[in-house]
Amino acid sequence: MRALWVLGLCCVLLTFGSVRADDEVDVDGTVEEDLGKSREGSRTDDEVVQREEEAIQLDGLNASQIRELREKSEKFAFQAEVNRMMKLIINSLYKNKEIFLRELISNASDALDKIRLISLTDENALSGNEELTVKIKCDKEKNLLHVTDTGVGMTREELVKNLGTIAKSGTSEFLNKMTEAQEDGQSTSELIGQFGVGFCSAFLVADKVIVTSKHNNDTQHIWESDSNEFSVIADPRGNTLGRGTTITLVLKEEASDYLELDTIKNLVKKYSQFINFPIYVWSSKTETVEEPMEEEEAAKEEKEESDDEAAVEEEEEEKKPKTKKVEKTVWDWELMNDIKPIWQRPSKEVEEDEYKAFYKSFSKESDDPMAYIHFTAEGEVTFKSILFVPTSAPRGLFDEYGSKKSDYIKLYVRRVFITDDFHDMMPKYLNFVKGVVDSDDLPLNVSRETLQQHKLLKVIRKKLVRKTLDMIKKIADDKYNDTFWKEFGTNIKLGVIEDHSNRTRLAKLLRFQSSHHPTDITSLDQYVERMKEKQDKIYFMAGSSRKEAESSPFVERLLKKGYEVIYLTEPVDEYCIQALPEFDGKRFQNVAKEGVKFDESEKTKESREAIEKEFEPLLNWMKDKALKDKIEKAVVSQRLTESPCALVASQYGWSGNMERIMKAQAYQTGKDISTNYYASQKKTFEINPRHPLIRDMLRRIKEDEDDKTVLDLAVVLFETATLRSGYLLPDTKAYGDRIERMLRLSLNIDPDAKVEEEPEEEPEETTEDTTEDTEQDEDEEMDVGTDEEEQETAKESTAEKDEL
C-alpha cells in the first residue's frame, strides 16, 4: 500500500515538473519576440558597443535639442564681402561641387596638425581625446553628412571670428582673383584652398551647415548657418566630442549622391589619400560568421537525449556548443588612406601617377607639375624631400615680393608637421617651388621662432636650392623655353641678382632674345658657341621692346659685321647682366656704353686716325662751343653706319633704358644722392663721319663758327641723338621750338614771322530783342493757362455745391 502511495506521489511530481518546463519555454519565446527573435541584440561585445557609440556621437541633435538650440542661439549677420564671396563660390563652382569634401578634410588635417604641434610642449593637450583622426559618416535617413576630426577645435570666439568673417585679410584679394580667373576662362577650384575660404564650399552641396566644436580652453559650442546668417550657442548636450570638430551638412536634394558610400570613398581617394592622418568612413560589409544554434533546436535535441538513459552520464561531461554559418552585415570604420607618406618611400617604388596625385592633393592645384625631384640628403643633416615646379606661376607671384610668406615648403620633423610659414626655407626668387621636407635631426619641442634660427636649417636650405636648380636644369629644352621661361624667367633673373653663391648655375638657365633668330630665345651657352673667332665680349642692347633694341643706332655696325647681339627687353634684364661679371670667361659689353671696339687691320687703323684728324675741328667746336656743358666729349664713332650721331654713356653711367627705368620708380623723390650722381653724368657724343649732315657741318664751321643755323643744327642733332639713344629730354618745348625754326628755314620762311591773328567776331544785335519777345510770349501763355485752370476749378466747385 505504501509502495502504491509513493508511486502516485512520484507521478504527481513528474506532471508538475513538466508543466513548469513548458511554462519556461513560453516565457523564453515571449522574450525572443520582444527582441525581434535575434540573439545579436543581447551580445555584449565591447568592440561592437564602442563602434556603435562612435556612430551615435556623429548623429545630429534630436528634435527638442534643435528647438532649444534655435530659440536660445545668438544670431549674427555675415559681412557684406563674405556674402558676396559665398555667392561667387557657389555660382562659379556649381560644376565642380565635389571639391567641398577635399576642403573640409584639408581643414580637418590642419586642425590635427595644430593640436599635434601643441602636444609637443603641452602634455595635457591630448587628454580630451588621444586619437588623431578624421571620420566621415553618411546618414541617408536624415539626409546628413558628418565630417569629424579630433583636432584643436574652436572656442566660441573662434567660431564667430573664423567662420563669420572668413579670410578677413584675403577676402578682397580672393574676390579679385576669382573674377580675373573667370574672365580669363581659367579654373577657379584651386583658388578656394589657396585663399583659406574652403569652408564656404560646403554650401555648394548643403542648404544648412552645423559645426559642433570643442576646444580645450572652452565648452562645446554649435555654429549653424544657411549661408545668409549664422548663430552660435553652447551645446545643450555638453561635451560629446572630447576635443575637435564635427561639421554636419544638411544636403540639398540634388546633392543626395554624396550620401552614397562609394561616392564618398572615391572622393577621399581622389583628393585626400595623401593626408597625413588616418581618414575613416563609416561603412558596411558582409561577413560569414558562426553563430550558436537556435534554443528551440537545442531544446529539441535535449528532449530527445533525455529519453536515452546513457544521456545521464553525458550531461556530466562538458558539451561543445553547436554552431551554424550565417551571413551578416557589419558596420565599422574603414581606413581610406593607408599609404605610407610618399616622401618616406624609396623613389624607385613610387609611380609617376602617385607623384602627380600627391602634388594635386598637397598643393590644391588642378594641373600636373611641370617637374619634380624626390631625394634623400645625407651628411651634416639628413632629410627626405620632394620638390615640385608648378605648370603655371601662382597668382600674385611678385606682389609684395619678399615682404610676406613667399614659399610653399612644408616642414616636417619626424613625420610631425611643424609649419609652412618659414620665410627662408627657400630664397625669395624660388618662391614658386612647392614641396615637403622631413628631417629627423631637428628638435621637436621648441618654438617655431627658435627652430627658424637653427643652424641646420641653413644647411637644409642650401641643399634644397642645389636640388631645385638641378631639377630645373633637367627640364627638356622645348618645355623649358616654351613654358618654364615664360612663367618663371623673371625668378631666374632675380636669382642671378640676389644669390651670389649660385650665380654661375643660374646664369646657365638664362634665356634672351637675340639677333640670331627673329622669335626664338637663346641661352648664353649657345651664344658663346656662335661667337666669332676673335670676339672676346658678349654684346647686348637694352630697350623697352625688341623693335626698339634692334633699331637702335648702337647696333648698326655690329649687325652689319655679323656679330650677334642679345636684346634685353624686360626691366629686370639690365640689372641681371650687371650682376654677372662674366660668363664662360667672356665679359659682357653694353653696346650703348663706351668700350665697343673691333679688331682692325693696320690699314683700317691708319684710315680711322686720318678721319679723326680731319674731323678734329668739328669735334672741338661741338665740345667747346655748340654743346658746351651738355657733353663730356665728342668723338668719331666706330659703331654707327646709318645714323648721324649717338649719345653714349660711360662705363659706370646709365644707359637710356636704365635711366628711363630709374626715373619711373614710384619711390623716386629726386633726393637720392647716388641716383642724382648717375643721372647727372655727362655722355659722349659720337658722330658718323660718313653721314652727309656731319660732313656739311664740318664744311660750315670751317667757314663760320658763329653761324646761328649751324649752332641750331648741332643742338637739334644732340637732342635727336638723345631720343634715339633712349634718353629723355629735359626740355621738350625748347626742342619743339628748334624743330619749328629748322622747318621755317627749310621752307624759306622768315624765322621771325608771326602767326596771323584771328578776326574778332561782331555781336549779334537782334539776340536781346528776340529773347525779350520770347520771354513775353511765354509769360502770356502761362497767364492764359492759369486763367483756364482757375475757370475749371470754379466750375468743379459749383458742381459739388449743386450735388450737396
From Swiss-Prot:
Pfam families: HATPase_c_3, HSP90. Glycans are attached at N62, N107, N217, N445, N481, N502. Phosphorylated by CK2. N-glycosylated cotranslationally at Asn-217 by STT3A-containing OST-A complex: this glycosylation is constitutive. In response to various stress, 5 additional facultative sites (Asn-62, Asn-107, Asn-445, Asn-481 and Asn-502) can be glycosylated post-translationally by STT3B-containing OST-B complex, leading to a hyperglycosylated form that is degraded by the ER-associated degradation (ERAD) pathway. In normal conditions, the OST-A complex together with CCDC134 prevent glycosylation at facultative sites during protein folding, thereby preventing hyperglycosylation. Residues 289-317, 757-791 have a biased composition (Acidic residues). The modification N6-acetyllysine is found at K479. Homodimer; disulfide-linked. Component of an EIF2 complex at least composed of CELF1/CUGBP1, CALR, CALR3, EIF2S1, EIF2S2, HSP90B1 and HSPA5. Part of a large chaperone multiprotein complex comprising DNAJB11, HSP90B1, HSPA5, HYOU, PDIA2, PDIA4, PDIA6, PPIB, SDF2L1, UGGT1 and very small amounts of ERP29, but not, or at very low levels, CALR nor CANX. Interacts with AIMP1; regulates its retention in the endoplasmic reticulum. Hyperglycosylated form interacts with OS9; promoting its degradation by the endoplasmic reticulum associated degradation (ERAD). Interacts with CNPY3. ATP-dependent chaperone involved in the processing of proteins in the endoplasmic reticulum, regulating their transport. Together with MESD, acts as a modulator of the Wnt pathway by promoting the folding of LRP6, a coreceptor of the canonical Wnt pathway. When associated with CNPY3, required for proper folding of Toll-like receptors. Promotes folding and trafficking of TLR4 to the cell surface. This is Endoplasmin. It comes from Pongo abelii. The lineage of its organism: Eukaryota, Metazoa, Chordata, Craniata, Vertebrata. The gene is HSP90B1.
